[in-house]
Amino acid sequence: MRMVLTKIVCTIGPRTSSREKIKELIDAGMSIARLNFSHGSREAHLEVIRNIRDSRSGAGRHVSIALDTRGPEVRLRTPEMKDIKVEGGEVLRFSLLSSEKDIWIPGVDLKSLGVDNRVFIDDGAIELRVVNVEEDGFECEVLNSGMIKSNKSMNFPGTDIGDRALGDEDKNDIAFGLENGIDMVFASFVSCRADVEEIRRLVGSKVPVVSKIESCLGMRNLKEIALCSDGVMIARGDLGVEIGLENMFSAQKRILYEVKREGRPVICATQMMESMTLKNAPNRSEISDVGNAVLDGCDCVMLSAESAVGMFPVETVKFMRSICADAERYDMESRKGAGACGVSSYVDGVVICSGTESQIEKIYLSKPETPIIVISESLWILRRFSIYRGIIPVYGKGSEDAEATLRRLGLRGRFLAVGREDVRMVSV
């Protein structure tokens, strides 16, 4: 029985913040725990970080903690934080000032906003048309009915609202995260190399930076962003709103092609198993979405609301893992049929003891279809390669005898359990 190589990123939220539930997610297949700093207090995030660190100690592998920055996204505040039901044709007012009757949107520059501009709420769930712009706010006509909830995101496609990839709150969040042992940063709304370099100056050289592509500018500067990042996330929610949903398919393919060409890992995110937020099985289209992401070469697939607030978080991870396993099995059979298999066809695992980054990258780029167990005392190695497909980072002191090292760390049966005693390995 082969191990699933594709990594699963889970957003931790109210449904999954306890130590017990995090342990269940890890056992189900979670490789990276994502903390979305657009929601929740730092105190709440600190408790989750502690719970993750306690829960991952018995996993036998490094489960990473990712801090997802707020970025320049606009978050609305409804009066008294209550949900607002809206109908098509209705006119709403948005205010830059806190108000008891208007929807509050702090920190937005309205100079570039004009009449007939489109505005979207909650990844496009609600579409609005600007009908009036004033000094302290603006009015919009609602184009489709729905529910507006407090703290949901707003998008202003094609409009400069004075945003920056890294605001003061983000800097404070990152400093807090570094102090408390986060493993990587997911940087929101990265639009150019300078955005990544600014974050690098904050985190130093030992924390990987994954750039989220979710704007037209990010798409335009994709290659330079990929070159200076440790990985790239296809953040399909905001990106779909920014570029138009009808263009999302080709954008996803282009991001994958450009980023993989530079040898960087890719995370596919947003609504991958969305229906499982409320029910215990995915839609057929979601199965195809996850499976095709694996076939296209994604290193990680990500859950957001499904694992943060969903009714079936653990079941969702298990189902996603099964879909990834099926896609990987199909991919390997296809490659065998085409005669494209290499050394991984004849071994059950590759073991790298105290290897260098270049050694690990070289083996990763050969696209083996078996686990690559990287045993290292370097926290940077463990962090960086935790988002690479097929690489299992394990903390430990390696030795020349890979078999002895695996047995000493209790890993041989756990990661190379293929139903035989004669496990075939290649050690590097």
Curated annotation (Swiss-Prot):
InterPro entries: Pyr_Knase, Pyrv/PenolPyrv_kinase-like_dom, Pyrv_kinase-like_dom_sf, Pyrv_Knase-like_insert_dom_sf, Pyrv_Knase_brl, Pyrv_Knase_C_sf, Pyrv_Knase_insert_dom_sf. GO terms for molecular function: ATP binding; kinase activity; magnesium ion binding; potassium ion binding; pyruvate kinase activity. The keyword Membrane does not apply. Mg(2+) binds at residues 214, 238. The keyword RNA-binding does not apply. Signal peptide: none annotated. Gene3D superfamilies: Phosphoenolpyruvate-binding domains, PK beta-barrel domain-like, Pyruvate kinase, C-terminal domain. Keywords: ATP-binding, Glycolysis, Kinase, Magnesium, Metal-binding, Nucleotide-binding, Potassium, Pyruvate, Transferase. K(+) binds at residues 36, 38, 68-69. Substrate binds at residues 34, 237-238, 270. Pfam families: PK (PF00224). The record marks 212 as: Transition state stabilizer. Its EC number is 2.7.1.40. It is an enzyme of class 2 (transferase). It catalyses: pyruvate + ATP = phosphoenolpyruvate + ADP + H(+). Pathway: Carbohydrate degradation; glycolysis; pyruvate from D-glyceraldehyde 3-phosphate: step 5/5. ATP binds at residues 36-39, 75, 152. Its cofactor is Mg(2+); K(+). Homotetramer. Belongs to the pyruvate kinase family. This is Pyruvate kinase. It comes from Encephalitozoon cuniculi (strain GB-M1) (Microsporidian parasite). The lineage of its organism: Eukaryota, Fungi, Fungi incertae sedis, Microsporidia, Unikaryonidae.
